[in-house]
């Protein structure tokens, strides 16, 4: 009997593994024709590096991007472009293949022209900032590698081009993208950008009345140097050239094969340093290059483990469902390319933006362009990139996002004290990577007596609560994976303290009492996202405060002597307000508000992300009524960009609507790479479009409430699926739905199986 049991377990394990491998290979992106331009590029990356890879007119191109490469204006600069040319050219014939090999995390390109055949492997070392290009051919070729830069001279940016930086529509004088330093050195091409002493940080500090604190404020742009070197063992310097790609002039620095060869290996090592001396940066770069080994095995293992950790593979008769499953995996690949980034993955393009005129023909700017800035962090967008990482078990990948806020904590507290004289960290929605409001959104044309802590902005005024979603994510990593979150407790506590201190401060300015007649904070003025403005007791803020406070109080990391303080604050948070449509009770966006300014539905934030309403919880009918009858919610409904309607539908168990909206969101993008969605409200590839799609698919498949785990709460019975997702309390759930029946369920630890509720036939 024991032998039979062992055989069955072994067989099941092998069967699971083989089906995962097959499903993953099926999701590989394969092109058999070359691309027309960079918009038809393929993402490749690893660690904190992203490449756009494409072959155009027989030449191989790569854009180089890396996390944290911010210039003086807070543009997230690319690190240049590589162009590979070959003689004789195997890519001048009719036989061609380019493939993204998801399982191992790299791309291959093969071509044949007459008798000559060649294959190129492009991969990034997950653990070192090094790009490898392996070129193999059946006959000797001469390879030319051209490092191309559009930053060979200073470039004045005007008009909409400044949307790529922190000045946006309100530049203060002439704004320039400063040139890079590029030269042949040490047998290769060395390139770097060194930030000048004066940056947008200094301009913003002065604008917001914080000059006296300038030397104590955290400044990530100061002394920043970033770049790299391109080398090849059989490559020598071969002079310069110049040209124009699309509308952007460039200059090139060429390396060429010393002698024709059947194999070449190009190495591009990158380095980012905070140092005032270029020599220090060069020393670090040299060390990185010396330790760069052409050994892909560790990176392959990382990608293999990444895919085995979590997946959703759909096999349905509905092609839209199949596309959703595939694009879920493709987008997760893009997220994995910034697993160890110094900065979080940007919602507006991540590491994979391309020439802007291919998105909007009027924007004939450089490849550095992205709408909504480089160093500007827009919290309502960013959150959608990071929430799905809980159910995929990618807790390590959430660290850059958490550390982003932790690094800015001191600045946010200084800002609060300077403006209002009380405690707490005030984080705004449009937040710079140094913790102050974006200067354009803050407003240059302000009444003389307008408070320095406030943004003079109809969309953003009084929107303080977006940081609380990141506080909740931190707390959830502890609940999901027993992560040690002690270092983040000051961030969570200071963010909560701001609300207590600030709304007592405002109440005392209006009158003698700090609280209302029921002993609650008066959350006025507030904001329901960017939509319901000058709100009194905004529902999104109330839901956020209640949920974060409850989670903090329950956290084992919170010192016992702190629990009474936060329990007392929880008692001061007012209740959610309601209103009626067609005699149906619905959740109101606030108790009162003055105007509607945008197209969000924060009245449903108690459903997601805050989970106050949902399957198996009191008031589900009220939340469903809000989704179905609230005229604003109906008017704002969409699947585009950051819209969350698919997530709301899934959380409410509305299978048909969840499937419709999620497949619309996750269907092929219309671009050559299926997961390059956008621009939506932001930019292409739109990462908050992909993130909200991921969340929706996950919530359709599995939800949790305390210890309970609901399977298929909004999943169509005819969508066959093999999945593996994470639940709270260090739990993984893997299984298959086949012909409407759950088979092969695997729950770890096994003790959690009793908490599973299969809803496929009960809804």
PLM features: residue spans?
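Bacterial Sec-dependent N-terminal signal peptides
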Residues: 1-24
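Non-catalytic carbohydrate-binding regions of carbohydrate-active enzymes
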Residues: 472-508, 565-594, 613-733, 737-738
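Aromatic-residue-lined binding/catalytic grooves and analogous aromatic/hydrophobic interfacial grooves
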Residues: 24-444, 542, 550, 560-632, ...
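Loop/turn elements at helix/coil->beta-strand transitions in domains of secreted/extracellular proteins
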Residues: 394, 518-519, 654-657
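A conserved hydrophobic secondary-structure block that centers on an alpha-helix together
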Residues: 113-119, 125-130, 139, 151, ...
């Amino acid at each position: 009997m024991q032998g039979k049991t062992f055989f069955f377990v072994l067989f099941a394990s092998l069967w699971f593994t083989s089906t995962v491998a097959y499903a993953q290979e099926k999701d590989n992106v394969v092109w058999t024709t070359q691309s027309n331009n960079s918009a038809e590029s393929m993402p490749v990356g690893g660690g904190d590096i992203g490449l756009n890879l494409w072959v155009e007119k027989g030449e191989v191109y790569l854009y180089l991007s890396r996390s944290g490469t911010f210039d003086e204006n807070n543009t997230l600069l690319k690190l240049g472009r590589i162009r590979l040319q070959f003689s004789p050219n195997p890519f001048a014939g009719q036989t061609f293949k380019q493939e993204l090999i998801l399982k191992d995390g790299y791309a291959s390109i093969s071509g044949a022209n007459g008798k000559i055949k060649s294959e190129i492997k492009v991969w990034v070392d997950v653990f070192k900032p090094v790009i490898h290009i392996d070129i193999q051919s059946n006959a000797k070729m001469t390879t030319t590698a051209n490092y191309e830069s559009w930053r060979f001279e200073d470039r004045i940016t005007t008009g909409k081009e400044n949307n790529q930086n922190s000045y946006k529509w309100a530049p203060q004088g002439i704004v320039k993208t400063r040139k890079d330093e590029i030269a042949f050195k040490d047998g290769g091409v060395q390139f770097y950008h060194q930030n000048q002493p004066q940056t947008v940080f200094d301009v913003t500090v002065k604008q917001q009345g914080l000059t006296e604190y300038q030397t104590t404020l955290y400044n990530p742009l100061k002394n920043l140097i970033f770049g790299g070197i391109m080398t090849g063992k059989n490559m020598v310097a071969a002079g310069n050239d110049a040209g124009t790609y699309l509308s952007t002039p460039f200059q090139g620095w060429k390396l060429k094969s010393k002698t024709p060869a059947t194999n070449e290996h190009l190495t591009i090592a990158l380095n980012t340093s905070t140092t005032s001396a270029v020599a220090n940066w060069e020393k670090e770069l040299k060390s990185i290059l010396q330790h760069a080994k052409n050994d892909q095995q560790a990176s392959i293992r990382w990608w293999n483990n990444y895919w085995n950790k979590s997946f959703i593979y759909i096999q349905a008769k509905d092609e839209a469902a199949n596309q959703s499953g595939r694009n879920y995996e493709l987008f997760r690949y893009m997220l994995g390319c910034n697993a160890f980034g110094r900065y979080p993955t940007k919602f507006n393009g991540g590491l994979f933006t391309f020439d802007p005129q291919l998105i909007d023909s009027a924007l004939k700017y450089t490849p550095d362009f992205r709408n909504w800035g480089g160093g500007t962090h827009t919290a309502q967008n960013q959150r959608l990139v990071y929430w799905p990482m809980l159910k995929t078990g990618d807790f390590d990948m959430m660290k850059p996002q958490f550390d982003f806020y932790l690094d800015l904590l001191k600045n946010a507290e200084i800002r609060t004290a300077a403006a209002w004289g009380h405690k707490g960290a005030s984080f705004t929605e449009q937040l710079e990577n140094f913790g102050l409001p974006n200067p354009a959104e803050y407003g240059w044309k302000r009444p003389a007596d307008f408070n320095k802590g406030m943004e003079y902005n109809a969309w953003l005024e009084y929107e303080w609560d977006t940081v609380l979603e990141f506080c909740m994510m931190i707390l959830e990593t502890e609940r999901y994976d027993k992560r040690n979150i002690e270092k983040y407790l000051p961030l969570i506590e200071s963010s909560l303290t701001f609300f207590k201190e600030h709304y007592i401060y405002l109440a005392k300015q209006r009158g003698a009492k700090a609280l209302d007649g029921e002993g609650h904070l008066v959350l006025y003025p507030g904001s329901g996202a960017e939509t319901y403005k000058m709100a009194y007791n905004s529902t999104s803020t109330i839901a956020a405060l209640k949920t974060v406070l409850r989670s903090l109080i329950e956290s084992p990391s919170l010192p016992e002597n702190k629990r009474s303080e936060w329990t007392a604050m929880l008692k001061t948070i007012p209740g959610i307000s309601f209103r009626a449509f067609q005699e149906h009770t619905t959740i109101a966006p606030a108790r009162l508000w003055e105007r509607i300014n945008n197209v969000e539905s924060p009245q449903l934030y108690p459903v997601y992300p805050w989970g106050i309403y949902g399957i198996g919880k009191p008031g589900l009918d009220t939340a469903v009524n809000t989704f179905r009858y609230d005229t604003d919610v109906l008017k704002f409904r969409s699947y585009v960009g950051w819209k969350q309607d698919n997530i709301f539908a899934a959380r409410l168990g509305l299978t048909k609507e969840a499937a419709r909206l999620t497949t619309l969101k996750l269907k092929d993008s219309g671009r050559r790479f299926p997961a390059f969605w956008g621009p939506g409200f932001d930019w292409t590839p739109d990462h908050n479009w992909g993130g909200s799609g991921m969340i929706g698919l996950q919530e359709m498949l599995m939800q949790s409430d305390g210890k309970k785990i609901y399977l298929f709460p909004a999943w169509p019975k005819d969508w066959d699926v093999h999945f593996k997702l994470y639940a709270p309390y260090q739990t993984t759930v893997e299984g298959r739905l086949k012909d409407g029946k759950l088979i092969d369920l695997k729950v770890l630890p096994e003790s959690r199986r009793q908490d599973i509720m299969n809803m496929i036939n009960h809804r």
